[in-house]
Amino acid sequence: MDLRTMTQSLVTLAEDNMAFFSSQGPGETARRLSNVFAGVREQALGLEPALGSLLSVAHLFDLDPETPANGYRSLVHTARCCLAHLLHKSRYVASNRRSIFFRTSHNLAELEAYLAALTQLRALAYYAQRLLATNRPGGLFFEGDEGLTADFLREYVTLHKGCFYGRCLGFQFTPSIRPFLQTISIGLVSFGEHYKRNESGLGVTASSLFTSGRFAIDPELRGAEFERITQNLDVHFWKAFWNITEIEVLSSLANMASATVRVSRLISLPPEAFEMPLTSDPKLTVTISPPLAHTGPGPVLIRLISYDLREGQDSEELNSMVKSEGPRILELRPRPQQTSRSRSLVVXFHGGGFVAQTSKSHEPYLKSWAQELGAPIISIDYSLAPEAPFPRALEECFFAYCWAVKHCALLGSTGERICLAGDSAGGNLCFTVALRAAAYGVRVPDGIMAAYPATMLQSAASPSRLLSLMDPLLPLSVLSKCVSAYAGAETEEHPNSDEKALGMMGLVRRDTSLLLRDLRLGASSWLNSFLEFSGQKSQKTSAPTVESMRRSVSEAALAQPEGPVGTDSLKILTLKDLNLKSSSETSETPEMSLSVETLGPSTPSDVNFFLRPEDAREEAEAKEGLSAKDGSSRVSNAFPEGFHPRRTSQGATQMPLYSSPIVKNPFMSPLLAPDNMLKTLPPVHIVACALDPMLDDSXMFARRLRALGQPVTLRVVEDLPHGFLSLASLCRETRQAAELCVERIRLILTPPAAAAAAAPPPL
């Protein structure tokens, strides 16, 4: 059903239902139902022209006709999903409104929630129109730190978002993944209620289980608390929540469901410099120094995963670097025979917004990759922000990559084919490590597979970024906190600075006692909250419920103790050095801890975001049409007269626009790298999500590489959220998306001659 037909059908049904409930007397429920259908009619009629104008030019921003993907298309698709749900619900109401089994309260609550969502989507459509009218031809990102980007951030903190996290949670995604998203949201708000109320991380998790019931049975309460958490809590909260999967119990359960491998070892690479041959002249070498930024030289942890035990993986030299992860488990199986070294090697960088997770979190799907690819995999445990901001993670990943290339025999590989693979933040590191390898003149990988990568860390409005208003896994406020932490804007805080003095056994005793206390408090809190919730329900007033919930959340979660002064001198010096050398006014590449003279310019003077002349004319005509409709294309004109989006009830919050020159560094935002740097990249294969707020990062990066004649492919999976690799075993759709990533890696690891022989003959 096309957009216009869907809108007309919805308007007709809304008018019919509105007339019916208007004739049902002066009752409050009938009045609210009549009003909600009147609102649906108004918003649908106002939204349809805006979506039509976006859809008419969306094809101009695709990589090619076979890859129809960009933020404009995604926004239109999301709005269509909301319209489709309202159409289905309106038909149901029209068919069952006279039945004695018609659940009036339930249907009213759902209709009101989706009406709120439709209203906010209309606001986003108007913002997308302004982006289209303001951006340069062919550009998806608004260029500049102020202007539309700053305006959108100011609007974002005032827009109501709770409707997207309650009854409408995940409506845009495939139905099979929505129960998981609901579980995550319930866990998040429960975890947030106890964050910093207890000192034991395991205790917080246990207490959250007892208080999650009321959030499960009241979607409006859950949505309001989800909105409060995403806007107010700092990056340390998100780091703690995302690291729940690191708990031994949960990681053990995940590993039980994953493939069984012969080798899974944590290896500590010593911080010792070594020599690497130059690709231009193997007789010459360059020194690869250990990571130095912020904290000085230190070891780099990598995890070696191999389905079979291969030659070199059990050598004395490698065993001397193995780091213990706990008590050894008695191996009752016969010792496996060593197989020959693989010709391939995969170097993986995990995601987590640069602030959370480790190779352990991503081990389940990496084990499957090792089995399917028949190649050893090393996953880098790089240091995380805010304790170790840029460029520490890049330095560690580059050091580990060079070490793996030099010592691939110890890893069970001959190193004939090497692939870099990563998701989200790890995808960013794939590109920047390859760029740095080319700058040093050492071997670059044979290819890159990046899943939903972040290539633009500068604050910049784009159509896909608008989706962060409703994304349950990647809200804009959370994305902003992660980027600020990686850029060094977030202050490093250590609320549990006394842990080092306790020692290992002291920590165990403390956490055990705290866990028992938390279980007692959690059970009592659950009973009290359930009784309180029941009493509030009987009064049929929603505002007191939200207010009491808001008071029940520890206010300490909104304030952080200031860290010690004078302990971060090396970190401060590094940030000052980066700020001084990353000025957008200069043409020199900012030197990092490992300086290289020939990295190229940091300001992308030869970056070309322009369309072909014929496409530019078509887009210009569309802009003229938008200006004529709106009366003006000025940024200050937010919405048409008479339309008012819903505003948040959470109070005023601040989302500062972080515009440090560091985020414009091409080793932080590879999309901003100049052409001469991007030409050094190997073949790139990107797997993106159509509904990901970072979709435009993938689309624009692929378009830049394609314009430079670089080999690049872009595959876009539908109806899945950001981070689907960590959900690979959840449903059929995520498994298929993960298999697509494996297929791209296999393509990189296949030698060109073998790939040409396996290709089908031309028709």
From Swiss-Prot:
Report keywords, A-Z: Cell membrane, Cholesterol metabolism, Cytoplasm, Hydrolase, Lipid degradation, Lipid droplet, Lipid metabolism, Membrane, Phosphoprotein, Steroid metabolism, Sterol metabolism
- What superkingdom does the record give? Eukaryota
Q: What class of enzyme is it?
A: hydrolase
Where in or outside the cell? Cell membrane; Membrane, Caveola; Cytoplasm, Cytosol; Lipid droplet
Residues with the modification Phosphoserine, per the entry, are 552, 554, 595, 627, 649
The molecular function terms of the Gene Ontology recorded here are: all-trans-retinyl-palmitate hydrolase, all-trans-retinol forming activity; diacylglycerol lipase activity; monoacylglycerol lipase activity; retinyl-palmitate esterase activity; rRNA primary transcript binding; sterol ester esterase activity; triacylglycerol lipase activity
Q: Which InterPro entries match?
A: AB_hydrolase_3 (IPR013094), AB_hydrolase_fold (IPR029058), HSL_N (IPR010468), Lipase_GDXG_HIS_AS (IPR002168), Lipase_GDXG_put_SER_AS (IPR033140)
List the EC numbers from the record.
Answer: 3.1.1.79, 3.1.1.23
Catalysis: reaction(s): a diacylglycerol + H2O = a monoacylglycerol + a fatty acid + H(+); a triacylglycerol + H2O = a diacylglycerol + a fatty acid + H(+); a monoacylglycerol + H2O = glycerol + a fatty acid + H(+); Hydrolyzes glycerol monoesters of long-chain fatty acids
Instruction: Identify the GO cellular component terms for this protein.
Output: caveola; cytoplasm; cytosol; lipid droplet; membrane; mitochondrion; nucleus
Catalytic center residues? 424, 692, 722
The record's annotation in Pfam families points to:
Abhydrolase_3 (PF07859), HSL_N (PF06350)
Q: Where is the signal peptide?
A: none
Pathway involvement of the protein, from the record? Glycerolipid metabolism; triacylglycerol degradation
Q: Bias category Basic and acidic residues: which stretches?
A: 616-627
Give the span(s) annotated as Disordered.
616-652
A Gene Ontology annotation in the biological process aspect, one of them, is: cholesterol metabolic process
List the ranges annotated as motif Involved in the stabilization of the negatively charged intermediate by the formation of the oxyanion hole. Answer: 350-352
Name the protein family. Answer: Belongs to the 'GDXG' lipolytic enzyme family.
Q: What does this protein do?
A: Lipase with broad substrate specificity, catalyzing the hydrolysis of triacylglycerols (TAGs), diacylglycerols (DAGs), monoacylglycerols (MAGs), cholesteryl esters and retinyl esters. Shows a preferential hydrolysis of DAGs over TAGs and MAGs. Preferentially hydrolyzes fatty acid (FA) esters at the sn-3 position of the glycerol backbone in DAGs and FA esters at the sn-1 and sn-2 positions of the glycerol backbone in TAGs.
Q: What is this protein called?
A: Hormone-sensitive lipase
Q: What species is given as this protein's source?
A: Ictidomys tridecemlineatus (Thirteen-lined ground squirrel)
**What phylogenetic lineage does the species belong to?**
Eukaryota, Metazoa, Chordata, Craniata, Vertebrata
Q: Gene for this protein? A: LIPE
